[in-house]
Amino acid sequence: MNTLEEINSLEEQIQQLITRKNELIDRACVEGRDIAMAHISSDVVSGFVPVDHLKVDKDTVVVYQGVPGAYSHQAMHDYFGKDIKNVNVAKFEDVIETVKSGKADYGVLPIENSSAGFVSGIYDMVGSSGLTIVGGDEVKVAHMLMGVPGSKLSDIQTVYSHPQGLLQCSEFLNRAGYAQCPVANTAVGAVKVRDEGDITQAAIASALAADIYGLEILKDDIVNNENNTTRFIILSKKKEYVKSAGNISVCFALPHESGTLYSILGHIKHNGLNMTSIESRPLRGRKWEYSFFITLEGSLMDPATIDALDHINKDSMDFKIIGTY
């Protein structure tokens, strides 16, 4: 073999080695991802089962808080359809207990409003319930002022609604000078006005509630923010998630030490994830220590998301995934 032939032979061998090297790199990436998936699955998402879609059939029962015409009622219809079997309960806690007892397959709860912020106490209830967030829905909130047939805007003295409803319409209410009375639910206020038949009373609720309870809309869309929207979550006893889910909600506790939250946020930033919400809640019996509830855009099928969750778990206390949806 002359010198030129030997050079060509070496170049061919080098190219074969480069090709083989790239194949091994690709395999290592896949194996590394699989190892990470296995690690996080055993340590953090133990028990979670991926599904193609949530099971919903003619026997499925959904529970919501309030009465027909409430925004939770509307969110239920939006997510499950109008033909879904349903029950309604008086309190948010009752939604959780109804699902835990097996009397309902899914529960609907409001979690956050774009104008008034988080709905107080919901994350605490969900985090300690053992239930899983398996879905979510956003409902455009168009509050109406409604009274009994024949009443006029000038007759109104007292307005009933959920505290969030009153807060979201505070500018209109304060200008008008009405007495404001909180009730358990926006639609509950509509029921009260209908039942008492007093022309000086009005409710703030949805157009659906006005239609259901035969009330007249005295003034429409009275919210402070025309883009007012409420985010709802869907709860289940089953620890499952739809494979196409793109949001993950987690909770964890942090000690009262410098840099602890910064460290958590660093793991999110390092993995290129977007945090869409965060709420802190004081820990009972632990002065100046807090639990945090955060929602990330991510997937349990994604190595970057898995890496972030793994590190958050290691750097926090009582870490728990409360849902991916």
Task: Describe the role of every protein-language-model region.
Residues 1-325:
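Domain-level signature for soluble enzymes in the chorismate/prephenate branch of the shikimate pathway
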